[in-house]
């Protein structure tokens, strides 16, 4: 056995050297997520994305992201009737550090949907595909339950199949008429107020009393060709030649000079 110093061990060796630790967040930027002007809360949060490097543009990675927000947070309301509705917003364009979103769907929370399903009643559901006046093809799911008559002594309140078919047909007609005559912005306002479900419940009372009638889910199947001007109208942004309007968190419009660049932050 040779006696002496091992030069490789004394220097640490090639594999044993310490690697430089780089914070991954130093390569990322924060962007503000903006909701359309049909909601009271304009800034719904922030999102992270890798900074633009070469051909990797940050805005391309932001477009298409889907954000799910409770209706109570969007409308600044503590009403329990709004808290179980979830709206999905999709990022369609990026202006400076603002991600402009549009409506992408609606759904009920799982706990609300499961709490409505009970024994001794009939569940009636209708699935309708309708097109808005501005070219959005939607698939709408409506749900309702039969209600027990106060004067009845029966434990159950089951509806006959003929009554179920009539109620489902009535649901389909009302949803088709309500959707086809309005644009997407007006339809979102109706979904927020739940006016379509209330009309269905009132119209079906003659066939069989209903309760817990809701628009359970809304899916966007097809969209018209993307138009920046229409999206900017939803965000109170006209877009001039000399100035560029940026939507603030409160919904006001701030004019900034053309070519404005936000200051670079030293730390994130």
From Swiss-Prot:
GO terms for cellular component: cytosolic small ribosomal subunit. It comes from the Eukaryota. Keywords: Cytoplasm, Developmental protein, Differentiation, Oogenesis, Ribonucleoprotein, Ribosomal protein. Its main location: cytoplasm. Residues 1-21 are annotated as: Disordered. It holds the Pfam family Ribosomal_S3Ae. GO terms for molecular function: structural constituent of ribosome. SMART domains: Ribosomal_S3Ae. GO terms for biological process: oogenesis; translation. It is found in: Cytoplasm. Component of the small ribosomal subunit. Mature ribosomes consist of a small (40S) and a large (60S) subunit. The 40S subunit contains about 33 different proteins and 1 molecule of RNA (18S). The 60S subunit contains about 49 different proteins and 3 molecules of RNA (28S, 5.8S and 5S). Essential for oogenesis; required for late follicle cell development. Belongs to the eukaryotic ribosomal protein eS1 family. HAMAP family: Ribosomal_eS1_euk (MF_03122). This is Small ribosomal subunit protein eS1. It comes from Drosophila grimshawi. The gene is RpS3A.
